[in-house]
Amino acid sequence: RGLGDVYKRQAVENNALFAINGDFYGNSERSIVIRNGIKYRDDVNDADVCVLFTDGTMQTYSPSEYDSDAVIAKGAWQAWNFGPALLDGSGNVLETFNTTKYLNSSNPRSAIGCVSAGHYIFVTVDGRNEGYSKGATLSELAAIMSDEGCMSAFNLDGGKSAMMYFNNSIVNAPDGGGRDLSDIIYIGG
């Protein structure tokens, strides 16, 4: 079994035309997990939260702003707890990011952004591959999302998790061949 096999299997089993890695919630017992409107885990940690609502809008929250009952009442459909948030909700790059200095350096990355309700941008940046790609800093990733017209954007799990799938194939060059993931974000075919 090769790395990424679980990722590809999840995509195939869900009839995904497109998929990107999620927040790798399976790597932590303390996190927020809302999938398809069902709250599975509600343990706020020190990471930002991104919520996709049933009306197609997307909003990011700092740990101190996040209120589980309020987002469920507002129609939370999916929630990812990794981050950080990249944009301020008006398309502007944040001046500081809620993360450690290490995570701010150039790395393979994946992000989800929202231009308007139901209009999303997904980005995966390869990295740690000398002569091919060094990756992106959070500021660089945020600038990409802003340049693409996103109002809000969120950094998903990166590193070996940064994978993008389209039409039955992984279409990027994941660091170390990728890793098996607990979750993906997908668009059905």
Residue positions per predicted region:
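Residue-level marker of positions within ordered structural domains that often coincide
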Residues: 12, 24, 117
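Non-catalytic positions within long, well-ordered alpha-helices that form the structural scaffold/packing
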Residues: 11-12, 146
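Alpha/propeptide regions of enzymes that mature by internal proteolysis
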Residues: 17, 21, 153-155
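Acidic carboxylate-rich catalytic motifs and surrounding loops in phosphoryl-/glycosyl-chemistry enzymes
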Residues: 1, 21-24
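Active-site-adjacent helix-turn-beta-strand microarchitecture at beta-sheet edges
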Residues: 23-103
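Conserved, well-ordered active-site substructure
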Residues: 28-45, 51-52, 96-151, 156, ...
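Short, small-residue-biased leader/transition segments that mark boundaries at the very start
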Residues: 2-7
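A generic secondary-structure signal marking the coil-to-beta-strand transition
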Residues: 15-18, 183
